[in-house]
């Protein structure tokens, strides 16, 4: 999970550019389901196994229905959300009746549907296995898992003699368990233990090759996902999550899209639907396009199904089939465009801007900042103390620094329908609220009001159309580029990449919705423990 909630209208959108894959290239059909979880009304109170099964079967009934619907639409793999079978907020003792032991598929080959009596107390595994087997589909689900340990052998073994894990389980299309992943980066999950060592879990399908597995809060950390992508060459990922949205930088679909685009991967992201907790936002993302769903008003689930290109390098033929595979975190154009080396970071001078559309205002700025050089100020964004400068006028060239880390922005407003304040912010430091991780962030944000103190607050809507070129002096190669439009409209940079002197940049022109956020979100993983 991450952070806190907000409200926005229903959004189920296909975001697409020109796809670089030929029609005769290998493809497959994937599905994700955003599930409204039937919750335990008192998760801190222990229950009998029969009551736990009765509760979980209510959610599994929905899984069974949605798996059949996905299969009818040709889906070969389906992903369900984190916590979607059992719910949230258990204690270590109150979750006991919900636990099952998921065997290691590297040691045990087992289809719970075909051999239901091999292991006891595995009713949930049996139902999931039969869903996969009946519908001839790979199925990814998340469930609580118990693994017995011996404190005489394992010094990290908990006092009660068992690990309790937040676990993703993958079933093949014949119901066999083919992968098991224990979530590494827990988010206020008192019922669960982190695994004693990092797990790098993959599984192989006959239709698309290899997939990697990770869960929710893992997406903000190096292990395991960056290792899966950069060191192991995984380009397709399944991602159960129970993510609480927080703007302006970490709404679920916003960061899912940024991660897929910047890491150069396919991401199958299934989130929980829970309005009271601000949970929504699922999607099927590739580096070039996305089918996603965001609904902060209704309470119904949502099935997404999409045909995708195979991105596993190990199953693609040499030559044209691999030519468009992306190097993770290298940046790339949205469509295939020939670019000379000298043009990769074009100066784009203000004097070259085309005439602006007429409008009621030349672009709002605080009265004290309507000068040639805007005055830096500080404001809290995502619990961090950002240094910002306000945008003024219709076009300009700004720089803002937090210590030696600097962000630069060249902008022009094509339309300003009403008074809206924008600011460019920089942050270089250790984030310590709801997790500890080191950030270098450049963010162009629409402020929630007309006062500087409102810059960094949560808003989903904007009317101002902004063309921009942004770059920052990052010390890390792990920079996630993202653009978010009004009404939770996902956008993407026209191009992004590394310029001279360690500067990472992105450019976007011609947006048709107002700009809410444009962000270069740098993660300095090696500084997390400072």
Which role fits each region the language model picked out?
Residues 1-7:
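Bacterial N-terminal signal peptides that target proteins for export
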Residues 30-32, 267-269, 282:
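Conserved beta-strand scaffold positions in the cores of enzyme catalytic domains, especially
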Residues 52-174, 243-266, 272-275, 428-431, ...:
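Cys-nucleophile CN-hydrolase/nitrilase-fold catalytic domain and related Cys-dependent amidase chemistry
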Residues 117-119, 125-137, 143-236, 240-257, ...:
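Active-site catalytic loop in hydrolytic enzyme cores
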Residues 271-530:
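C-terminal beta-strand edge segments of enzyme domains
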